[in-house]
Design a protein with these regions (language model features):
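A short, sequence-level motif marking secondary-structure junctions
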Residues: 52-57, 123-124
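Hydrophobic adenine-recognition pocket in adenosine-nucleotide-binding enzymes
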Residues: 8, 62
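Vicinal oxygen chelate
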Residues: 63-115, 123
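Short, charged/polar surface micro-motifs in flexible loops or helix N-caps
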Residues: 44-47, 55-57, 67-72
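Conserved beta-strand in the GNAT
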Residues: 48-51, 107, 116-119
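Core segments of cupin and vicinal oxygen chelate
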Residues: 2, 9-47, 54
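Short glycine-enriched loop/turn motifs at secondary-structure junctions
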Residues: 2-4, 55-59, 99-100
Length: 124
């Protein structure tokens, strides 16, 4: 396989706020922004672009694989900022993390209402 993931546009009600939120949570690197895009770079050089679409948008699910130390820092940030979070995607186990797939995981909403999942072990 030679295909690799390069970039995605994440629909945002406030691109600058989203850039700040994701930058803090994912410890993402600053990237030059242009036009309607506020940009960050995460692992493997993947570009996250935040932009406001012309109309309404449906929430999406984005999962990020973190190492254990990064997960600890991200979870401390989530708790420190009082961000509502859950151990499960159905949002039944509020304020908890899970221990699925021999790792840890947590679900939360970003400022534009997208579902984020932070995990320490890949599913496959």
């Amino acid at each position: 396989m030679t295909a690799r993931f390069n970039h995605t546009i994440i629909a945002s009600s406030d691109p600058q706020k989203m850039k700040s939120f994701y930058g803090d949570l994912l410890e993402a690197a600053e990237a030059p922004s242009w036009g309607p895009f506020q940009n960050l770079i995460i692992g493997d050089g993947v570009l996250l672009q935040f932009a406001t679409p012309p109309g309404d948008f449906q929430p999406q699910h984005y999962a990020y694989l973190l190492d254990d130390d990064h997960f600890d820092r991200a979870y401390d940030l989530i708790q420190g900022r009082g961000i509502e979070h859950w151990a499960d995607p159905q949002r039944m186990q509020e304020g908890r993390i899970n221990h699925e797939h021999d790792g840890r995981g947590v679900y939360l909403l970003d400022p534009s209402g997208h579902y984020l999942e932070l995990i320490t072990r890949a599913y496959l």
